[in-house]
C-alpha cells in the first residue's frame, strides 16, 4: 500500500482519465485539470481518428476491472477490408483464427472514461488553463492568460497527460540535459463520414478495418455503434495528389470518382464534410527524461506522441499506466524509484512503437494493394 498523496493530473484525455482511476483505487486524492470544456457537454469537432483497442490496451483496462464496461461501446474488428481502385473488395483476417481488435469512437470512449473516473472519486476541473509547473515542489500555475495573473495550486505529485504539446513537458524542456525532438509529417488527415442506413444498420461491413490504399495517400474507415463509419483521408499536404490540389467541389468530386469510386453511394455528404472539417497535422515527439525527481512525470502523448498508422497511440499510453502501476506496487512510497524504473522500462518500447507506426503507413497505403500481399 502507498501513503495517500495529493496528485494532480494535467489533461482529461484517455490516458489522464484512466490514470486518475488507477490512482484513486490506490487511495490518492486526484484532481484532473483540462484547459478545454468538459467533452461531455460539447459538440464533436470533426477532427478525430477512430481508435483501435488491442491486447496492450485491454490488459490495462482488465487489471482494473473495466474491460467489459468498455467493450460495450466498441465494435469487434477481425479483418482488414481492402478496396482496390478497380472496385474489387478483398479481406485479410488478422493473425490467428478468432483474433480481433476493437473499434472505438474517441469521443464516446473519452466521455465514458470521465464518468468512470468521477465514479471512482477523481475530481475534474475543466476550462482551467495550466501554464506552468514547479518541478521542485509539484505546484501548478493556472490563469486566464499566459501573461496575466496566475494562481498557485499545491500538490505532492504532478502527472503531465496533456498531449503532444504538453505544458508540463514545456517546463521540463528548460532543464539541462533534457532531450526533445518534434517532427511534423508531410501527410495530413481529414475526417469524412459514412452515415448509417435508414434502419440504423451499417452500409459496409462493420467488422472490417476498411482501407482504400492508393500509394502515397489512402482512405480508412472504422465502424461506430450508431451504424455510421468514421473515415479518415490521409494524404500529403502538397504535390500531385494532395490537399492543396483539392480546393473546389468539382476537383474533389472528380478525384473521388477516379480514386475511390465505390464511396460515391456511401459518403453522400462528401463535399460538405471535406470543406467543413479541418485538415489536421500529424506530429511525432520524443523526449527524455520523462520524470523529475519524485515530483513530476510525463505519460502518454506528452512523452511520446506517435502517428496513428499502427493503431497503438492509445494502447501505448495505457501500457505506460500498466508499467507505472507495477512500479507503484513494487516500490510503495519510493516515488523517485517508481519514476526512474517506469521511464527506464517504457522509453525503448515507446521509441520502437513510434518507428513501427511510421513504417506501417507504407504497408497500409501501398503494400495492402499489392498482389503478393493479398
Q: Which residues does each predicted region cover?
A:
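C-terminal helical "tail/cap" subdomain of flavin- and related membrane-associated enzymes
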Residues: 3-5, 326-374
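Glycine-rich FAD cofactor-binding loop and adjacent beta-loop-alpha segment at the N-terminus
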Residues: 4-78, 83-85, 97, 101-108, ...
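Active-site metal-binding loops of divalent metal-dependent hydrolases
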Residues: 35, 163, 302
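Helix-loop-beta segment of a Rossmann-like dinucleotide-binding subdomain
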Residues: 88-104, 234-238
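Helical element adjacent to the flavin cofactor pocket in flavoenzyme catalytic cores
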Residues: 104-128
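Conserved FAD-binding catalytic core of PHBH/FMO-like flavoproteins
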Residues: 115, 119, 128-132, 137-282, ...
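Glycine-rich phosphate/pyrophosphate-binding beta-alpha loops
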Residues: 218, 282-286, 303-315
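Short FAD-binding loop at a beta-strand-to-alpha-helix junction that anchors the flavin cofactor
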Residues: 292-307
Amino acid at each position: 500500500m502507498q501513503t495517500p498523496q495529493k496528485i494532480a493530473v494535467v489533461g482529461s484525455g484517455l490516458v489522464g482519465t484512466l490514470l486518475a482511476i488507477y490512482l484513486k483505487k490506490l487511495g490518492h486524492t486526484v484532481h484532473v485539470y483540462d484547459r478545454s470544456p468538459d467533452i461531455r457537454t460539447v459538440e464533436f469537432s470533426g477532427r478525430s481518428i477512430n481508435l483501435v483497442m488491442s491486447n496492450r490496451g485491454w490488459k490495462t483496462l482488465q487489471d482494473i476491472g473495466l474491460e467489459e464496461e468498455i467493450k460495450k461501446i466498441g465494435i469487434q474488428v477481425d479483418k482488414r477490408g481492402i478496396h482496390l481502385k478497380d472496385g474489387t473488395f478483398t479481406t485479410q483476417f488478422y493473425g490467428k483464427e478468432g483474433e480481433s481488435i476493437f473499434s472505438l469512437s474517441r469521443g464516446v470512449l473519452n466521455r465514458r472514461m470521465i464518468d468512470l473516473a468521477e465514479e471512482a472519486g477523481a475530481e475534474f476541473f475543466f476550462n482551467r488553463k495550466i501554464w506552468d509547473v514547479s518541478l521542485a515542489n509539484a505546484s501548478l500555475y493556472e490563469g486566464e492568460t499566459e501573461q496575466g495573473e496566475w494562481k498557485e495550486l499545491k500538490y505532492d505529485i504532478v502527472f503531465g497527460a496533456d498531449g503532444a504539446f504538453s505544458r508540463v513537458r514545456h517546463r521540463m524542456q528548460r532543464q539541462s540535459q533534457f532531450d526533445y525532438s518534434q517532427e511534423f509529417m508531410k501527410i495530413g488527415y481529414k475526417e469524412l463520414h459514412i452515415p448509417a442506413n435508414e434502419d440504423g444498420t451499417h452500409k459496409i461491413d462493420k467488422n472490417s478495418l476498411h482501407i482504400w490504399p492508393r500509394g502515397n495517400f489512402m482512405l480508412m474507415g472504422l465502424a461506430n455503434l450508431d451504424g455510421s463509419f468514421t473515415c479518415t483521408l490521409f494524404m500529403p499536404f502538397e504535390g500531385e495528389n494532395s490537399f492543396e490540389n483539392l480546393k473546389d467541389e468539382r476537383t474533389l468530386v472528380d478525384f473521388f470518382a477516379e480514386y475511390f469510386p465505390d464511396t460515391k453511394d456511401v459518403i453522400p455528404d462528401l463535399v460538405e464534410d471535406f470543406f467543413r472539417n479541418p485538415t489536421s497535422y500529424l506530429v511525432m515527439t520524443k523526449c527524455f527524461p520523462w520524470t523529475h525527481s519524485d515530483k513530476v512525470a510525463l505519460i502518454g502523448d506528452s512523452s511520446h506522441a506517435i502517428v496513428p498508422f499502427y493503431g497503438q497511440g492509445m494502447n501505448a499510453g495505457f501500457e505506460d499506466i500498466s508499467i507505472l502501476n507495477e512500479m507503484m506496487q513494487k516500490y510503495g512510497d519510493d516515488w523517485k524509484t517508481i519514476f526512474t524504473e517506469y521511464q527506464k522500462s517504457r522509453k525503448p518500447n515507446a521509441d520502437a512503437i513510434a518507428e513501427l507506426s511510421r513504417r506501417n503507413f507504407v504497408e497500409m497505403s501501398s503494400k495492402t494493394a499489392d498482389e503478393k500481399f493479398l
